[in-house]
Regions:
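Contiguous, structured surface segment used for ligand recognition
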Residues: 1-130
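Conserved, mostly hydrophobic/aromatic
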Residues: 13, 86, 138, 180, ...
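Gly/Pro-rich turn-and-neighbor structural signature
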Residues: 23-25, 114-121, 189, 196-197, ...
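Hydrophobic or amphipathic alpha-helical targeting/insertion segments
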Residues: 42-43, 74-113, 195-222, 226-255
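The substrate-binding groove and active-site-proximal loops of carbohydrate-active enzymes
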Residues: 81-84, 141-166, 182-192, 227-245, ...
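An acidic-aromatic substrate-binding cleft motif
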Residues: 106-161, 167-187, 359-362
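Catalytic domains of carbohydrate-active enzymes, especially glycoside hydrolases
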Residues: 161-189, 200, 204-213, 258, ...
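Structured mid-domain segments that build the active-site/substrate or prosthetic-cofactor binding neighborhood
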Residues: 182-185, 192, 200, 216, ...
Length: 401
C-alpha cells in the first residue's frame, strides 16, 4: 500500500506542478537537496531518523495506522518527513501530502478541479495523526441500477454482465485510501458476480490496503446470496444441513486465509432474512451459539490459533437483535456491530457492561435503503444533520472499533 500511495502522490504532483517527482531509494537518508523523506517504523534507517527528529517511537506504534508528518529544518535544510507507524499509516501520511498540495480525495469521482501551481510554500510544522475508529469503510449495496450498469456499460466495457472487476474496484479503493478508509463490504446482490469470483479483485484490495469484509447475511467471507446457488449443496440450513454449510464456509476461509479479512460471524438466511430450520427465539439462540463456536474453531484451525489476532464481527441486525437480547452469549473478543433502524436512527448502543468487551463495538449505518416498508435512494439519502447526531452518539458510546 505504501508503493500505491507513492504512485498516487506522484500522479498528484504532476497534476499540480506539471513535473515529475524523482523517487530515490537510498541508504543515505538525508542529502543537501530538497527532499520528501518517507519511511515506516521497523524499516531500516527508520529508527535513526526517528531519533534524529526527536520523536517518541511509541507515539507512532501505540496506535495502528498512525503517521508523523512534518516540514522541518534538519542540518540547515528544510525537508518534509512522512513516517508511518505501519504501512497503512505511511500511506495515509502520503495522502495527506496530496491534500496539502490542494488535491481533493474526490478528484476523480467528483471531478474536483486541481489548481495548478508553480511553487509550493509550506511553513514549518509537525503533527502526529491516528484514526479515531479502527476500521472505517463502506458497503456497496443496492448496486443493481447504479454501480453495476455504470461499470458494465461505461467505465469497464467488455466485462461479463454483472461483473465488478479490478478496474472498477481500483477506483473505489483509491477513493477509500485517499479518505483514510480501510474497509469495504463488496457488492453482493444477485445481479452481481461475487467479489471473490472475479480474478484480480482480491489482489486489488491488498494493493490499496483494504480489509475486505461482508454484510450481516454473509458469514465467513462468503456472498451467500450469490454463491450458495453455485457452490452450495441442499438448503442453506444449519439445523438440517450443517455439514454442507460448514464445507461452503471452509472453502472460502482456506482461499483467503492469508488475505486481510474482517470475518462476519453468525448466520441469517440466504439474503437478508431469518435463518432456516429454527423457528422460535430460543431455537435460533441455540443454533447461533453452535454456529459461533464452529466458525471460530474453523478460523483457529485455518487462519490463526490465536483468535484475538483475527478481526471478527457479529452484527445484531433486524431479528438478530432480538436473539441477542434474549441472552445470546457472544465471545468477548468479537466486535459487536450495532445497527440503525434502516432510517438513520440507531437501535442500540452498548451499555456499561457491554463497553467492557475486549472486541469493542462498531456501527452499521444506512445512508440509503432499499427494502420494506419504504425505500429511500439516490438524492433522498439520510439527512447529514441526522447522520452527524447519530454517529457522534455512537462514537461517544465507544463504538470505535
Amino acid at each position: 500500500v505504501v508503493h500505491t500511495a507513492v504512485e498516487l502522490v506522484g500522479h498528484d504532483y504532476l497534476s499540480v506542478f506539471g513535473d515529475t517527482l524523482r523517487l530515490v531509494s537510498s541508504e543515505s537518508v538525508l542529502s543537501a537537496t530538497p527532499q520528501i523523506i518517507v519511511t515506516t517504523c521497523g524499516v531500516d534507517k527508520a529508527d535513526s531518523l526517528i531519533a534524529l527528529l526527536g520523536i517518541q517511537a511509541d507515539s507512532l506504534t501505540t496506535h495502528p495506522e498512525s503517521f508523523y508528518l512534518a516540514a522541518k529544518d534538519v542540518d540547515g535544510a528544510m525537508r518534509m518527513f512522512v513516517i508511518g507507524g505501519d504501512a497503512r499509516g505511511t500511506a495515509y501520511g502520503l495522502m495527506e501530502l496530496s491534500r496539502l498540495m490542494g488535491v481533493s480525495p474526490w478528484e476523480w469521482w467528483a471531478d474536483s478541479p486541481i489548481a495548478p501551481r508553480k511553487r509550493w510554500v509550506v511553513d514549518a510544522f509537525e503533527k502526529i495523526c491516528y484514526p479515531a475508529v479502527r476500521y472505517r469503510g463502506i458497503f456497496l449495496n443496492d448496486e443493481d441500477f447504479a454501480l453495476v450498469p455504470w461499470a458494465n456499460e461505461t467505465y469497464d466495457k467488455g466485462t461479463r454482465r454483472g461483473e465488478l472487476g479490478p478496474k472498477t474496484y481500483a477506483r473505489i479503493f483509491e477513493l477509500l485510501l485517499r479518505l483514510r478508509a480501510n474497509t469495504c463490504w463488496p457488492a453482493m446482490h444477485e445481479c452481481t458476480v461475487p467479489f471473490f469470483f472475479v480474478e484480480g479483485n482480491r489482489e486489488m484490495a491488498e494493493k490499496y490496503g483494504i480489509y475486505m469484509g461482508a454484510s450481516h447475511c454473509e458469514p465467513m467471507a462468503r456472498n451467500t446470496n450469490g454463491e450458495w446457488r453455485v457452490s452450495g449443496v441442499g438448503e442453506y440450513d444449519y439445523v438440517n444441513n450443517s455439514e454442507e454449510v460448514k464445507r461452503f464456509w471452509r472453502e472460502r476461509v482456506e482461499e483467503v486465509a492469508e488475505t486481510p479479512i474482517i470475518y462476519t460471524l453468525g448466520m441469517r438466511g440466504v439474503h437478508d432474512g431469518r435463518m432456516n430450520g429454527a423457528k422460535t427465539i430460543d431455537e435460533q439462540r441455540t443454533v447461533l451459539t453452535q454456529v459461533l463456536a464452529d466458525q471460530r474453531a474453523m478460523l483457529a484451525e485455518l487462519v490463526d490459533s490465536h483468535l484475538v489476532h483475527i478481526p471478527q464481527v457479529f452484527i445484531p441486525y433486524k431479528e438478530v437483535l432480538d436473539i441477542y437480547n434474549s441472552g445470546l452469549e457472544v465471545p468477548d473478543d468479537i466486535t459487536l456491530m450495532w445497527c440503525d433502524d434502516n432510517y438513520g436512527y440507531i437501535r442500540h448502543l452498548p451499555d456499561s457492561v457491554e463497553r467492557l468487551r475486549s472486541g469493542g463495538h462498531g456501527l452499521y449505518y444506512h445512508v440509503s435503503y432499499w427494502g420494506r416498508p419504504h425505500d429511500y435512494l439516490w438524492l433522498p439519502s439520510t439527512h447529514p444533520a441526522l447522520m452527524t447526531t447519530e454517529l457522534l452518539r455512537a462514537y461517544d458510546a465507544d463504538n470505535r472499533n
